[in-house]
């Protein structure tokens, strides 16, 4: 584990599936428009689906007093000519811990891991999520496009902003 302020950062593995499932479902329920998936879908998944997800990609967890308070994921791009890129996805910090450096610490951890293998990292963020957009800009991400009507929730459309940070 890596110390970051008062938070411990650690790679989440299959053994973390139960706590990962709990925080993931909390994220989907608390901020439904911020995620492409839905609570109603993932709440029915067996624990093994979360174990598989943890085995497939690089997930970082932020702990405070042994409680998982934040998560984020690094997903490599697969096509041969895109292997220099990875995506940071599924970023969530519990509301009581937002604005306290948790997301910043998780991004620093993921970017350090990504820099070992990738030249750049990408992310997409709900355009209406001003706090997240400001944070990502502060962390050095640059917007390069907007997808209009990227997601639809309760008959309302939401745009996504695409951002990139060059690591090399």
Q: Across the structure, where does each feature detected by a protein language model lie?
A:
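Conserved active-site alpha-helix within GNAT-family acetyltransferase domains
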Residues: 100, 104, 128-146
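Conserved beta-strand-loop-alpha-helix junction that forms the acyl-donor binding cleft
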Residues: 123-133, 150-156
């Amino acid at each position: 584990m890596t110390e970051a302020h008062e938070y411990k950062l650690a790679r989440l593995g299959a053994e973390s599936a139960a706590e990962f499932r709990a925080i993931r479902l909390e994220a989907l329920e608390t901020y439904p428009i911020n995620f492409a998936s839905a609570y109603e879908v993932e709440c029915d998944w067996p624990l093994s689906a979360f174990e598989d997800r943890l085995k497939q990609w690089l997930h970082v967890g932020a702990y405070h007093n042994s409680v998982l308070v934040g998560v984020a994921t690094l997903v490599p791009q697969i096509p041969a000519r895109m292997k220099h890129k990875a995506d940071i996805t599924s970023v969530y910090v519990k509301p009581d811990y937002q604005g306290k450096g948790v997301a910043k610490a998780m991004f620093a951890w993921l970017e350090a891991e990504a820099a070992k293998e990738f030249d750049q990292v990408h992310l997409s963020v709900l355009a209406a999520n001003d706090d997240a957009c400001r944070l990502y800009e502060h962390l050095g991400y640059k917007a390069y496009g907007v997808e209009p009507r990227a997601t639809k929730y309760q008959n309302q459309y939401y745009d996504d902003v695409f951002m990139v940070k060059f690591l090399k």
